[in-house]
Regions:
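ATP-grasp fold ATP-binding core
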Residues: 86-88
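N-terminal glycine-/serine-/threonine-rich beta1-alpha1-beta2 phosphate-ribose binding loop
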Residues: 1-83, 92, 96-107
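Predominantly a Rossmann-like dinucleotide-binding segment in NAD(P)-dependent oxidoreductases
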Residues: 104-135
């Protein structure tokens, strides 16, 4: 795992301690598991946490493109690519988003995007009966 920023509400360190996974100092180290070449079977890319500026349109300038470029660099240098899941949209900028999309075609890897929220644990647990009204 790699985290670009570690805000006060970050859970990565506690979860790493609890479940025994490593946190690396760079994206390259995380994808290579500290070695010299790509060593993972897939990438879950969540680029929407931390303190980043806003542009004149009020868009939060999360560095998804810049972080994704580092993932692509590792793929290119390793001579192989793996599936990437991008939490949320690719970028606030069409040109950057298009480049991100195009890389999956050029390097022949599956690229998925959406929200990871439906896949997270509910704390406390909550199971609603099918057809239950929700306010």
């Amino acid at each position: 795992m790699y985290t670009d920023q570690v805000p006060s509400n970050d859970m990565s360190r506690a979860l790493a301690s609890q479940y025994g996974f490593r946190i690396f100092g760079t994206i390259r180290e995380a994808l290579c598991l500290g070695g010299g070449t790509l060593a993972v079977d897939g990438v879950a890319f969540i680029g929407e946490h931390g303190e980043y500026p806003f542009n004149e349109k009020g868009q939060h300038l999360y560095p998804r493109y810049e972080l994704y470029k580092q993932i692509i660099d590792v793929f290119r240098e390793s001579g192989r690519a793996v599936a990437v899941y991008c939490d949320k949209h690719f970028s606030y900028d069409w040109t950057k988003a298009k480049w991100m999309y195009d890389q999956s075609h050029e390097l022949h890897f599956p690229l998925m995007a959406g929200s990871s929220v439906p896949l997270t644990w509910r704390r406390p647990p909550l199971e609603l009966e099918l057809g239950s009204p929700v306010d």
